[in-house]
Amino acid sequence: MNLTVVNHPLVQHKLGLLREGDISTNKFRTITHELARLLAYEATRDFELEPITIDGWCGKIEVQQIKGKKVTVVPILRAGLGMLDGVLDLVPSAKISVVGLYRNEETLEPVPYFDKFVDSLDERIALIIDPMLATGGSMVATIDLLKRKGCKSIRAIVMVAAPEGIKVVNEAHPDVPVFTASLDSHLNEQGYIIPGLGDAGDKIFGTKHS
């Protein structure tokens, strides 16, 4: 299984705060930002480096820089936007691509309604961000879109995942690693992660789930 559960104490502490049932919109946004940054740190841990020579204060000096491919961050709309700034804290030069999907509440299948990708995806590392990986349908659809556009290096960053969704993603795209703060118990009959976080999109945007 191509899955990394990040067990860092700060990650687990912040995840626990997000699980509070009566959490305010402001607090949920703030902690989502912080957690996204920590998860992105883990997801970029093995980026390849190369030495370059620069003019330092005392003359020429050799330093390390990220080698080769540049990053595009791909939030899945709308909830993925809540994680965007946290990831950009670490990779501020990253270009942003977006994918718009919503879940059909009857079939639980993803329905695409918008996408906009940066150029030269074949030369980039894509970091897909979405707070919840539930059924896996939206993540698989997003990976499908990226691969059709030529992207060969893709990673997924989610705050909470369900075993059912991880299984779907791994079966469809075993080459795509998933980074999460928690692999939760299961999905309920409505396709929500248990114990999960509730509706992350509604909590980030301050809207009510109908």
Swiss-Prot record:
What is a biological process (GO) this protein takes part in? uracil salvage
Q: Which residues bind uracil?
A: 193, 198-200
How is the protein's activity regulated, according to its record?
Answer: Allosterically activated by GTP.
The pathway where this protein functions is: Pyrimidine metabolism; UMP biosynthesis via salvage pathway; UMP from uracil: step 1/1
* Assigned EC number: 2.4.2.9
Kindly list the cofactors needed: Mg(2+)
Keyword Magnesium recorded:
yes
The kind of enzyme this is, by top-level EC class, is: transferase
- Whether Chloroplast counts among this entry's keywords is no
MF annotations from Gene Ontology: GTP binding; magnesium ion binding; uracil phosphoribosyltransferase activity
How the cofactor binds, per note?
Binds 1 Mg(2+) ion per subunit. The magnesium is bound as Mg-PRPP.
Matching entries from NCBIfam families are given as: PRK00129.1, upp
Similarity field: Belongs to the UPRTase family.
Q: What does this protein do?
A: Catalyzes the conversion of uracil and 5-phospho-alpha-D-ribose 1-diphosphate (PRPP) to UMP and diphosphate.
Q: What's the protein name?
A: Uracil phosphoribosyltransferase
Origin organism is Laribacter hongkongensis (strain HLHK9)
